[in-house]
Curated annotation (Swiss-Prot):
The gene is tig. It is found in: Cytoplasm. One of its GO terms (cellular component) is cytoplasm. GO terms for biological process: 'de novo' cotranslational protein folding; cell division; chaperone-mediated protein folding; protein transport; protein unfolding. It comes from Edwardsiella ictaluri (strain 93-146). This is Trigger factor. The lineage of its organism: Bacteria, Pseudomonadati, Pseudomonadota, Gammaproteobacteria, Enterobacterales.
């Protein structure tokens, strides 16, 4: 077997392999002997068919199978010999085969990038310093009350926390546009559901009024034909409602799993949940900064095969969220996911190198702690823990999470870390990277 390796483009490789005619014939003869032991041909006993008859009957198909097998086995031998690490499925490019002659073919594939980690001491991390205080707990309880509120019709103007039922028709330069019309649309004020200026135009008006709002669509609006455009909305205000908050009775409090129905019990439960959420938010914020710094300091080539695979994963996840099937998932435009997929591949490759260089292995105590932390959000934590312990796939996922945490901590130990005081709301409402 003769082997040569070419670099095609970037991480692309082409391995050229030549298999000698002698090795092909030996492999064909060996396989024909195996076939002869099992062959059933009229006029001959099983295993007693002459080799020339076996060759006539099965020679062509056996030779085809042997060539396919030799191509695969010799490719594996070649990449081991050349110390190549392929990504994805290789593409076989067979040459012309002539009986009695050497057979040449090529295999095209991508390899993993060679990564030499650098700039780890240039990673900058601001570690949030924050606690859950009494005011945070009170604000969260008020939010829970608002979520459970009822609505009643009110006289007078639309206020900042009211709800309005409207008809609207949008137009640009006097022409209506797709998606710009609705009837009996219920709009809760202060939630930022509409484009800037729309809610402000509703405030202060009364039921029965008809008026026009002038707004401008943001430059980053999702519809290309509306980006940055000035528009008018004709509004019919049909109904104004105000929120009626539930009383803090024992019955109301028990809805949140507080058995004794006491306000102190509710505050304790809310604080516990907020503390758990805060811990996750702090961890995620630190992790995001570490990974941003790692990616910024280490520019690497990315195998297209890995990006393609990650795009398919993201497509399926998106389809699942909206109740779509496999076919619908694959029809989603790859452009929607390409940037995120590439980022995930880069992070995965760099973290893999950190794990390898640091010789990290998933710590069992950390794995168990992660499972217990996750289970604490459920009504019966022990049941969840036992479920995970019996599920191999879930346990592998948790080990990977633990290993990723350990890699982030290894990077954090080399980073430039400072502390920054913040509040619960600031941290929880901060956009995630």
């Amino acid at each position: 077997m003769q082997v040569s390796v070419e670099t095609t483009e970037g991480l692309g490789r082409r391995v050229n392999i030549t298999v000698t005619a002698d090795s092909i014939e030996k492999a064909v003869e060996s396989e024909l002997r195996n076939v002869a032991k099992k062959a059933r041909i009229d006029g001959f006993r099983k295993g007693k068919v002459p080799m020339n008859i076996v060759a006539q009957r099965y020679g062509a198909s056996v030779r085809q199978d042997v060539l396919g097998d030799l191509m695969q086995r010799n490719f594996v031998d070649a990449i081991i010999k050349e110390k190549l690490n392929p990504v994805g499925a290789p593409k076989y490019v067979p040459g012309e085969y002539k009986l009695g002659e050497d057979f040449a073919y090529a295999v095209e594939f991508e390899v993993y990038p060679e990564i030499e980690l650098k700039g780890l001491d240039t990673i900058v991390v601001e570690k949030p310093q924050v606690d859950v205080n009494d005011a945070d707990v009170d604000a969260m309880i008020e939010t829970l009350r608002k979520q459970q509120a009822s609505w009643s019709v009110k006289e007078g103007e639309v206020g900042a926390e009211d709800r309005a039922t409207i008809d609207f028709t949008g137009s640009i330069d006097g022409e209506a546009f797709e998606g710009g019309k609705a009837t009996d649309f219920v709009l809760a004020m202060g939630q930022g559901r509409m484009i800037p200026g729309f809610e402000d135009g509703i405030l202060g008006h009364k039921a029965g009024e008809e008026f026009v709002i002038d707004v401008t669509f943001p430059e980053d609006y999702h519809a290309e034909n509306l980006k940055g455009k000035a528009a008018k909305f004709d509004i019919v205000l049909k109904k104004v409602e105000e929120r009626e908050l539930p009383e803090m009775t024992a019955e109301f409090i028990k809805r949140f799993g507080v058995a004794d129905g006491s306000l102190d019990g509710l505050k304790a439960e809310v604080r516990k949940n907020m503390t758990r959420e805060l811990k996750n938010a702090v961890r995620n914020r630190i992790k995001a900064q570490v990974l941003d710094g790692l990616v910024l300091a280490n520019e690497i080539d990315v195998p297209a095969a890995l990006v393609d695979g990650e795009i398919d994963v993201l497509r399926r996840q998106a389809a699942q969220r909206f109740g779509g099937n496999e076919q619908q998932a694959m029809e989603l435009p790859r452009e929607l996911f390409e940037e995120q997929a590439k980022r995930r591949v880069i992070v995965g490759l760099l973290l893999g190198e950190v794990i390898s260089k640091s010789e990290l292995k998933a710590d069992d105590a950390r794995v168990n702690a992660l499972i217990e932390e996750m289970a604490s959000a459920y009504e019966d934590p022990q049941e969840v823990i036992e479920f995970y312990s019996k599920n191999k796939e879930l346990m592998n996922n948790m080990r990977n999470m633990a290993l990723e945490e350990q890699a982030v901590e290894a990077l954090l130990s080399q980073a430039q870390v400072s502390e920054k005081a913040t509040t619960f709301n600031e941290l929880m409402n901060q956009p995630q990277a």
